[in-house]
Amino acid sequence: MTFIGIDKTIITILLFVVMIESTRAQTTDTIATRWRGYISLDQYSKPFWRADTIVDETIQPMRINGKINTNLLFKASAILSVKVANYSKEFIQGKDWELKDGQLKILPQSTIPFLDKEELVFKAFKPEFSMHGKVPGTHVLFTEKPYFSSLQIIVTYIKAKDEKWKGFVPAFANRNLPSSIAKLKSKQNLKVVFYGNSIEAGYNTSNFMNTPPYMPTWADLIIYKLRQHYGPQISFSNKAVAGKMASWGREQVNSVVIPEKADLVIIGFGMNDGSAHVPAETFRSDIDGIIRAIKKQNPKTEFILISPMLPNPDAIQSGIQSIYQSELNKLAEKGVVVADMTAVHAELLRHKLYQDMTGNNVNHPNDYLARWYAQIILGFL
């Protein structure tokens, strides 16, 4: 593999940091339940674009030019609660915050945590809190520890009536995923396999990080809701491995995925490919190779292809991720649909900060953005 424009040592580092915790794929068919007592998975899986009440939207309060920014996705008609993202504290209206012009405003005497913009990019290396920046000689704030969830806040609010989501919305795929939908509706056995990198493995979601509110990975959230709606006969296996690219997925598909005899495979490579500047045509060929290899053995298998979320533009991981969505669209056909998380994330970034939606400030989603992954994919099913 040739990495264009990036030092090989740095590439080794950036692929290593996403494998700090584990490189093992999930091998069990169970879903952790530690979230009970903190959150409702029914509320967490309700599509943001349909909900009147937005539950636990994440904000990273950010002081920019002396003003603390707190950007909600939608204007609010009422704010119901404001908490630390790790559920360690709830803040008081009139003391810590107020609603002004449809947005959350932090009051001067508030104890709500915040970051200064100047803390995001810096020159001096900070042990355990640094990643190479895209600009040579810089670093970006980064950690795989549950640091950001102690600084981010979650806001539950009632959306103003005229507020609408203007981004990508999935359509029920009864025509494009006919076999999977038919099995779900008739309550036949359905095997789902997840295949990808650290994002698909669930890195930086709160249960993965062993911190409240212990939200399951977005893959687990999908299975939870499918079982709730269609029945317990749905099985799954998560074969995602941190740090991997689509070329690895193609090389390993025969030994890793095909033996699972999946009815539906959800494929999510692209983040690491984009960091390594893998050409668009090569990326498409690798994904196509995965699909063809599986269909050769299991012709009725269907696929959901996920275009990658975007990396922090200040981090060295920021590459050509945004161009892969159009390549995946070229593979769409009956039995293959594309979940455009690239467009979803881009639309979110028109209204919110990158730090509102990240678990490591480089290339992993927090619970909030992970919920978008689950909701978008569930929208097809």
Question: Where do the model's predicted regions map?
Answer:
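Proline-aspartate-enriched helix->loop->beta-strand connector
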Residues: 257, 261-267, 299
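Charged helix-capping and loop-helix junction motifs
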Residues: 281-289, 320-325
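Catalytic His-Asp segment of secreted/periplasmic serine-dependent ester chemistry enzymes
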Residues: 308-381
